[in-house]
């Protein structure tokens, strides 16, 4: 058997080269896959096919030959995409991004403890505790995130059922049913209605065969398959049937030309699994944030390391300080906060039918600036529906709404009765059994999409079609074929006063009209004159221009003299009239838009998101749906529209004058990347029609070159490469193929485009709320670090210890920080432009300056005020504390004098110091009350926003209760070195808390009064 042209190109080569060679080869393979499908089998005659594959076109291959080929090519199955082992996924959660910062902190803590253990007789265990706690935080949060993602991938596992199981092949002249994996190139295969196509086939004979290619090309209409070579493009020609598409009716026989990964479907799957998904925007934001925090920590650490050497501390002490400052800068609780916030949003989205596969995708949808949407099933209902009829010389509109709440038309006309009778009788579609309790539009139908649409329409308008068919029993029929372009049947007519036989016919409108000499108007036959022919032509063009599929209908009462009862009608040697019939009307069908889509597209537009339609369907249909859902808005013209309006050739119109643009896949094939960039840049409303899977990918890459964050929706296998390449891929849960669900980051459980808009809203909200959570969490870093810094510089007893810092970060601050995730939007977040990933960061300099430089400093003052009050009440006035550290911390000195000359032992001094730690901790809780309330909003006043967030109010009480518990619970002095406080000491920080609230309210007032002013530029994060 000859080895087929173009075959070598797709052989998955053995991976032998290393390093760069391997990478270059991968890139070359990807470029190869992005090219259009190249095959020439559809152009070959049957003799050439026989020579190329060595197959007997009647007897098939011999069993021995088939076994040889199977050994050479391997099984006819898609290579499963390389899956990430579970332990790698787990490690990613443990060591990715933010976790790394905490691990470094933990290692530094153990290092500091090691240094202390080696140099001191009785080292303090603080650093050891801190190291252990940091490690525990990372491990627990890592397990939590891993569990979240594993849960989503479990749902994914349940989707696997893509590949056909059995195939009917002819070998040694006998038909045999074999496992589809054993089909080989050159096999002679038979398929019938209801089968999945087992491999790429070159059809050699067919009988009324139609296939559903929607999972591959996106066309909702079944495509005819026959042995004829009808198009240069292998995806468009009629004599190739593709692996894993469905045969919906008829039978066909074909020769296998490609199997497994070499099939068109296989190439798409390989293309999808070979694409690298980029970093998600939120991951980039967290990385940016880590850089900032690390920068601040290292800067402070090194500055004070040098300062402590200048102040004549020893090297080892200076290193301990350095480590202490760096660790104090790490916000221990933030990793858990971010994870919990994203999880809460993911749960909220799941309730609204968006299943998110990885947590980071939650926010990506919020920063989306371009959505490339598939048409069939996403924007539309994925069911052909009767949209218009033309009879009695006027166009009537049918009801296309999902719940039949739309307009109706006049059903009393005698012509409509005749038209509905033809549509019901000349129709092979039937409702499947046992569905009487379902609404008509929801019932499953056996038959092609157009006939199902007619069946449902007639059932809704005129009652039971089954009864109609019983009343007019079918005698003979000629099924639709591509040469005649019509379908005809003859029925018994039981109506009194009418001839006994009724001939009904439907088909391509122009072919039907050619066979008619009269037309039915208001139930009366009239001769078909030029005027009526023009009226027909205008109606046909108008309906076709709406992107609808139009069928013509005619009938003839067969005279009883020529066709008495029992007449033998012969369909092979036609013995009845098929000309001079009576034209009755036109019916047009379309896959109508979903009800919620126009509103969703409008919301996207006001949110600054560009919606681009990318479909495999015809440009006219695509444009009609785009106009119907608002992707091309009212009054916006394409180049063709302008040319038609000005009555000039298209070539004379300047493309930049047109806001809207419909691009045909064949034009896209010849475009340079620069030309595509031009289209994406200068047109606001774009439709790509007749695109191939590879082109979808090129469009997504083009949008990303413009700096857009791209979301792609799709349900077919053909969408999977684009889904994988996009910043966020959105697959359909009901109609989606498994390959597309595997490639996507998010799944719409109800297949509705409107759910994406909900997702965008949730994504934007979580971004805003994460900012607030981070601002809240970071603020307490300053009152945690400054005591340590003053301890080094001013040589005073340590005002706040390590253990108390942990109680704040992992205790009192956690619930309030998470409660901000429940905060409602301040303004209509769907009215603003998408954020610019380059300039609008999650954590920017302004947020750091607010948290560290302004609010944090006021908090630190509150803490120090409490510290000095308690020290003074115990006899140590502020001026006496300066420089006392060395003697204070010396366990052998038991006679340190205070300002009044009283002597203090080491134990007594330490109890006062730990009481100060507790009081400083409580002061931070008190000032964090105000911080939590001001973090609710970034621009509005808290009085405008209100205190509707119940979780936040719970958080305020929870942190206060926790602080009181840690302070007053017996035994805390031993466990955490925390001692009970006098009630008056709680109030020391109150004025500072009030100051924070007033300061921030005034700042926000100025921002609202002077938008774009100095205060907004410097402090609005």
UniProtKB/Swiss-Prot annotation:
Extracellular side: 107-129, 307-318, 791-800, 865-916, 969-983
Modified residues (Phosphotyrosine): 10, 258, 540
Keywords: Acetylation, ATP-binding, Cell membrane, Cell projection, Ion transport, Magnesium, Membrane, Metal-binding, Nucleotide-binding, Phosphoprotein, Potassium, Potassium transport, Sodium, Sodium transport, Sodium/potassium transport, Translocase, Transmembrane, Transmembrane helix, Transport
Stretches for region Phosphoinositide-3 kinase binding: 80-82
Binding-site list for ATP: 485
SMART domains: Cation_ATPase_N
Molecular functions per Gene Ontology: ATP binding; ATP hydrolysis activity; metal ion binding; P-type sodium:potassium-exchanging transporter activity
Catalytic activity: K(+)(out) + Na(+)(in) + ATP + H2O = K(+)(in) + Na(+)(out) + ADP + phosphate + H(+)
Posttranslational modification: Phosphorylation on Tyr-10 modulates pumping activity. Phosphorylation of Ser-941 by PKA modulates the response of ATP1A1 to PKC. Dephosphorylation by protein phosphatase 2A (PP2A) following increases in intracellular sodium, leading to increase catalytic activity.
Membrane-traversing stretches: 86-106, 130-150, 287-306, 319-336, 771-790, 801-821, 842-864, 917-936, 950-968, 984-1004
Biased composition (Basic and acidic residues): 1-11, 26-36
Annotated region described as Mediates interaction with SCN7A, given as residue ranges: 594-715
Disordered: annotated segments: 1-36
Annotated propeptide span(s): 1-5
Known partners and oligomeric status: The sodium/potassium-transporting ATPase is composed of a catalytic alpha subunit, an auxiliary non-catalytic beta subunit and an additional regulatory subunit. Interacts with regulatory subunit FXYD1. Interacts with regulatory subunit FXYD3. Interacts with SIK1. Interacts with SLC35G1 and STIM1. Interacts with CLN3; this interaction regulates the sodium/potassium-transporting ATPase complex localization at the plasma membrane.
Family assignment from sequence similarity: Belongs to the cation transport ATPase (P-type) (TC 3.A.3) family. Type IIC subfamily.
Protein name: Sodium/potassium-transporting ATPase subunit alpha-1
């Amino acid at each position: 058997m000859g080895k087929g042209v173009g075959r070598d190109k797709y052989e998955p080569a053995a991976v032998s080269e290393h390093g760069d060679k391997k990478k270059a080869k991968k890139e070359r393979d990807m470029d190869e896959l992005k090219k259009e499908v190249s095959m020439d089998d559809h152009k070959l005659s049957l003799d050439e096919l026989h020579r190329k594959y060595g197959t007997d076109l009647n007897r098939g291959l011999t069993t021995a030959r088939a076994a040889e080929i199977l050994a050479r090519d391997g099984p006819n199955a898609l290579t499963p995409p390389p899956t990430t082992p579970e332990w790698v996924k787990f490690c990613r959660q443990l060591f990715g991004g933010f976790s790394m910062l905490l691990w470094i902190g933990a290692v530094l803590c153990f290092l500091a403890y090691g240094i202390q253990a080696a140099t001191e007789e009785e080292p303090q265990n603080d650093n050891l505790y801190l190291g252990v706690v940091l490690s525990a935080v990372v491990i627990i949060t890592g397990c939590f995130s891993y569990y979240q993602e594993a849960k989503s991938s479990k749902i994914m596992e349940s989707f696997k059922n893509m590949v056909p199981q059995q195939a009917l092949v002819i070998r040694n002249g006998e038909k045999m049913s074999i496992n589809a994996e054993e089909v080989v190139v050159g096999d002679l295969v038979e398929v019938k209605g209801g089968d999945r196509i087992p491999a790429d086939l070159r059809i050699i004979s067919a009988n009324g065969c139609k296939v559903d290619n929607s999972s591959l090309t996106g066309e909702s209409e079944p495509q005819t398959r026959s042995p004829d070579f009808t198009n240069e493009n292998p995806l468009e020609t009629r004599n190739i049937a593709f692996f894993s598409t469905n045969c919906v009716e008829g039978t066909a026989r074909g020769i296998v030309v490609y199997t497994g990964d070499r099939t068109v479907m296989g190439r798409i799957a390989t293309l999808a699994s070979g694409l690298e998904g980029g970093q998600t925007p939120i991951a980039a934001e967290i990385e940016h944030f880590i850089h900032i925090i690390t920068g601040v920590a290292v800067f402070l650490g090194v500055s004070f390391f040098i300062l402590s050497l200048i102040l004549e501390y020893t090297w080892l002490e200076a290193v301990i300080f350095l480590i202490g400052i760096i660790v104090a800068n790490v916000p221990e609780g933030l990793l858990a906060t971010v994870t919990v916030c994203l999880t809460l949003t993911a749960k909220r989205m799941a309730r609204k039918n968006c299943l998110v596969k990885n947590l980071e995708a939650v926010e990506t949808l919020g920063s989306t600036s371009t959505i490339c949407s598939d048409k069939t099933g996403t924007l539309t209902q994925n069911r052909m529906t009767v949209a218009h009829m033309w009879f009695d010389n006027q166009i009537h509109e049918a009801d296309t709404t999902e719940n039949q709440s739309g307009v109706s038309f006049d059903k009393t006309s005698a012509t409509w009765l005749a038209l509905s009778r033809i549509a019901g009788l000349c129709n092979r579609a039937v409702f499947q059994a046992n569905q009487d309790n379902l609404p008509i539009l929801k019932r499953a139908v056996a038959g092609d999409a157009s006939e199902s649409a007619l069946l449902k329409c007639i059932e809704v308008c005129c009652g039971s079609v089954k009864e109609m068919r019983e009343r007019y029993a079918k005698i003979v029929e000629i099924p639709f074929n591509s040469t005649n372009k019509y379908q005809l049947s003859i029925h018994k007519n039981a109506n009194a006063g009418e001839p006994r036989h009724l001939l009904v016919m439907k088909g391509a409108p122009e072919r039907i009209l050619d066979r008619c000499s009269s037309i039915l108007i208001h139930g009366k036959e009239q001769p078909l004159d030029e005027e009526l022919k023009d009226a027909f032509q205008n109606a046909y063009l108008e309906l076709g221009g709406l992107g609808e599929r139009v069928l013509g209908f005619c009938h003839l009462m067969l005279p009883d003299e020529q066709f008495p009862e029992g007449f033998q009608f012969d369909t092979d040697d036609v013995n009845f009239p098929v000309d001079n019939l009576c034209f009755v009307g036109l019916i047009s069908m379309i896959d109508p838009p979903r009800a919620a889509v126009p509103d969703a597209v409008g919301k996207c537009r006001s949110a600054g998101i560009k919606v681009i339609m990318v479909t495999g369907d015809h440009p006219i249909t695509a444009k009609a749906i785009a106009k119907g859902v608002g992707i091309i808005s009212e009054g916006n013209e394409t180049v063709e529209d302008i040319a038609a309006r000005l009555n000039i050739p298209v070539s004379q119109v300047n493309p930049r004058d047109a806001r809207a643009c419909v691009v045909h896949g064949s034009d896209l094939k010849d475009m340079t990347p620069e030309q595509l960039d031009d289209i994406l840049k200068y047109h606001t409303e774009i439709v790509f029609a007749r695109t191939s899977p590879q082109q979808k990918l090129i469009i997504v890459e083009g949008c990303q070159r413009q700096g857009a964050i791209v979301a792609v929706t799709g349900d077919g296998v053909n969408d999977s490469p684009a889904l994988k390449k996009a910043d966020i891929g959105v697959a359909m849960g009901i109609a989606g193929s498994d390959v597309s669900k595997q490639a996507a980051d998010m799944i719409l459980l109800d297949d509705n485009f409107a759910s994406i808009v909900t997702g965008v809203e949730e994504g934007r909200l979580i971004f805003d709320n994460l900012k607030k959570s981070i601002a809240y969490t970071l603020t307490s870093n300053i009152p945690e670090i400054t005591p340590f810094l003053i301890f080094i510089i001013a040589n005073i007893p340590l005002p706040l210890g390590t253990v108390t810092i942990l109680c704040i970060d992992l205790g009192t601050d956690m619930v309030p920080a998470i409660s901000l995730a429940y905060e409602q939007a301040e303004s209509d977040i769907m009215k603003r432009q998408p954020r610019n990933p380059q300039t609008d960061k999650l954590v920017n300099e302004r947020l750091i300056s607010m948290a560290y430089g302004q609010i944090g400093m006021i908090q630190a003052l509150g803490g120090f005020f409490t510290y000095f009050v308690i020290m003074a009440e115990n006899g140590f006035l502020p001026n006496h504390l300066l420089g006392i550290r060395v003697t204070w911390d010396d366990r052998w000195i038991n006679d340190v004098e205070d300002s009044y000359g009283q002597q203090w032992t080491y134990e007594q001094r330490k109890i006062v110091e730990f009481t100060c730690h507790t009081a400083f901790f409580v002061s931070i809780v008190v000032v964090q009350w105000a911080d939590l309330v001001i973090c609710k909003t970034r621009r509005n006043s808290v009085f405008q926003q209100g205190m509707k967030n119940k979780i936040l109010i719970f958080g305020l009480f929870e942190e206060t209760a926790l602080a009181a518990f840690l302070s007053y619970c017996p035994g805390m002095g031993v466990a955490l070195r925390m001692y009970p406080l006098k009630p008056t000491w709680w109030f020391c920080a109150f004025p500072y808390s009030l100051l924070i609230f007033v300061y921030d309210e005034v700042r926000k007032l100025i921002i609202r009064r002077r938008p774009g002013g100095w205060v907004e530029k410097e402090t609005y994060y």
